[in-house]
From Swiss-Prot:
Transmembrane segments: 10-30, 32-52, 56-76, 120-140
Protein name per Swiss-Prot or TrEMBL: Rhomboid-related protein 1
Bilayer topology: Multi-pass membrane protein
Keyword Ribosomal protein: no
Pfam family, one: Rhomboid
Places the protein is found: Membrane
Catalytic activity: Cleaves type-1 transmembrane domains using a catalytic dyad composed of serine and histidine that are contributed by different transmembrane domains
InterPro entries given in the database record: Peptidase_S54_rhomboid_dom, Rhomboid-like_sf, Rhomboid_IM_Serine_Proteases
Lineage: Eukaryota, Metazoa, Chordata, Craniata, Vertebrata
Swiss-Prot/TrEMBL GO biological process terms: proteolysis
SUPFAM superfamilies, alphabetized: Rhomboid-like
Molecular function terms, GO-annotated: serine-type endopeptidase activity
Length: 164
């Protein structure tokens, strides 16, 4: 249970509640749990490969998987959603994600304070976003699912397993 600071802890908790809970209500606990854990795993593996000296703290990979899966869900079910604020929801999610990634990049490359240790990496955020979009388009339910979408699900799942 480590985070960079109260800002990251609060931001991650807020996004998990605002985005994760509605996604769970629509798509079920199992799918969203798998999505979140895949984002955390991909974020951790990406940091261990690309930025080996940076510590991995927090659940940003999972949070970004949830956020980008939410964006994929809105795009995938655009016509079937009855919410009049679809575009506003997407813009707000993108602004929140961009501001947190910008903060993480700033913390990583700014000179550390004398009392602080190495700054955490931002690569977990990016890996979580990639996992969220790719898995969100495949494992989340489409309101108008077609056979070609089911075939695409198996192809992306196989590719995802291969890359892990």
């Amino acid at each position: 249970f480590m985070h960079v600071g109260l800002e990251q802890l609060g931001f991650n908790a807020l996004l998990q509640l605002m985005i994760g809970v509605p996604l769970e209500m629509v798509h079920g606990v199992l799918r969203i749990s798998l999505l979140y854990l895949a984002g955390v795993l991909a974020g951790s593996l990406t940091v261990s490969i690309t930025d080996m000296r940076a510590p991995v703290v927090g659940g940003s990979g999972g949070v970004y998987a949830l956020c980008s899966a939410h964006l994929a869900n809105v795009v995938m079910n655009w016509a079937g959603m009855r919410c009049p604020y679809k575009l506003l929801r997407m813009v707000l999610a993108l602004v929140c994600m961009s501001s947190e990634v910008g903060r993480a990049v700033w913390l990583r490359f700014s000179p550390p304070l004398p009392a602080s240790g190495p700054q955490p990496s931002f690569m977990a955020h990016l890996a979580g976003a990639v996992v969220g979009v790719s898995m969100g388009l495949t494992i989340l339910r489409s309101y108008e699912e077609r056979l070609r979408d089911q075939c695409g699900w198996w192809v992306v799942l196989l590719a995802y397993g291969t890359f892990l």
